Amino acid sequence: MEKKDLKPAGVFKYFEEICQVPRPSKKEEKMIAYLKAFGAKHNLETKVDEAGNVLIKKPATPGKENLQTVVLQSHIDMVCEKNNDVQHDFLTDPIDTEIDGEWLKAKGTTLGADNGIGVATELAILADDSIEHGPLECLFTVDEETGLTGAFALQEGFMSGDILLNLDSEDEGEIFIGCAGGIDSVAEFTYKEVEVPAGYFFFKVEVKGLKGGHSGGDIHLGRGNANKILNRFLSRMAGRHDLYLCEINGGNLRNAIPREAYAICAVPEDAKHDVRTELNIFTSEMEDELSVVEPDLKLVLESEAPRKIAIDQDTTTRLLKALYAAPHGVYAMSQDIPGLVETSTNLASVKMKPNHIIRIETSQRSSILSARNDMANTVRAVFQLAGANVTFGEGYPGWKPNPHSAILEVAVESYKRLFGVDAKVKAIHAGLECGLFLDKYPTLDMISFGPTLTGVHSPDERMLIPTVEKFWKHLLDILAHVPAKK
């Protein structure tokens, strides 16, 4: 199978086009320009708000003018993650895609099908005048991945739809009617620089090979957290020897489970062999604990050139203990919906910043607002006990399920008629923009669905090609059977 043969042709044509357009979160200017040019080319009414959200309108096909107005919605930014051995500049370089069996993936980077395949689907519908639909509005939001900025900034009156179809879900055959809310918690330690005494062995220890994944959609899988694994080893060494921590770096994005982390440390020269011995023991322990979920886990130890400066040992002790105590993973399962994670937390990144700051970013999610806040307060308490300064982000609301939704009824009936099996109606632990849309447009009737993606927010992201055509057929059938205006 070659890329030119992929079906539906229009969807994959536009997906390949937008893979050529750099679109990191908060840097979507080129994608906004692309959408404005697309609207002009097709003589479609196009407008852009102050945040950068783009709305392209398309009139109803003849005879469908009496249907309710549908908003198709996707976000235009993508998570930019790459393997350490890959040279790629997300600000300038296109995404290099390839076919692997029935899957489409990128070479060593995130694919951007989250949510590029939704964007491409909307463009294919806008460009094809043979598709039957009522009044249509295509909403393209900015910065979903790192702050839901576009959804927060959306103003009343920017769109006029009655129904919103969010195209940002990742399991074909599943229709989502609710999602978790979330909040970010950031802890900062201020450290002093100290000199490392003479006669110390310097080494770098690195955790890599983990799967990572989405901190909402994959948190229940029990995958390894590179920050937690690295900290376990550092804490072990600090308990055995006089440890100086010179550098620490782990994870990247608040909504991605960290795949890689490293630290550069120093211990007395006579402890050199013990470090290697203990790493071998620790590696065996980690492999035993995570053999099923993380078969490619690697811990690598290398000697380092001596450094003069390290983090003061008081801060190092408080940092390591806080990272050890900080929760990560599923905290509670839903008592209403079997199999749904209710509350979770992600220990996302540990970074050294200017002005002697070590910043730890975490994110908490829950379908219950009070439980979300309780989890954030738990994380705050851990880091405050260790002497860190903790701040919260703005947070975003969840989306409460409406099992009596009219468009849900249409979508469920359509799927059964097209494919002979029932679609699964579910809520999702990941955050979607839908909760924020309801704040501004409380009468919107919404569902979310999409083709099958795996490994999102990591270089393992891939899209199951046959599910794109099923998703396409389902979407077009829904558009043809939208309820009439009331």
Show the residue positions of the predicted features:
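Acidic, glycine-rich active-site loops and adjacent beta-strand->loop/helix elements
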Residues: I76-M78, L139-G147, S169-E172, K211, ...
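Substrate-recognition/cap regions that form aromatic- and gly/pro-loop-enriched pockets
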Residues: L340-A430
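His/Asp/Glu-rich mid-to-C-terminal helical/loop segments that flank catalytic regions of hydrolases
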Residues: K36, G157, R223-R240, E269-K272, ...
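Zn-dependent metallopeptidase/amidohydrolase metal-coordination segment
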Residues: K7-V11, Q335, E342-N355, S363, ...
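Midchain, well-structured core segments that form catalytic/ion-binding scaffolds
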Residues: P22, E102-K105, E145, F152-R365
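Active-site metal-coordination/substrate-binding segment of hydrolases
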Residues: K64-T146, A151-D162, F202, Q313-T316, ...
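Short, conserved charged micro-motifs
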Residues: E65-N66, E269-E278, L369-M375
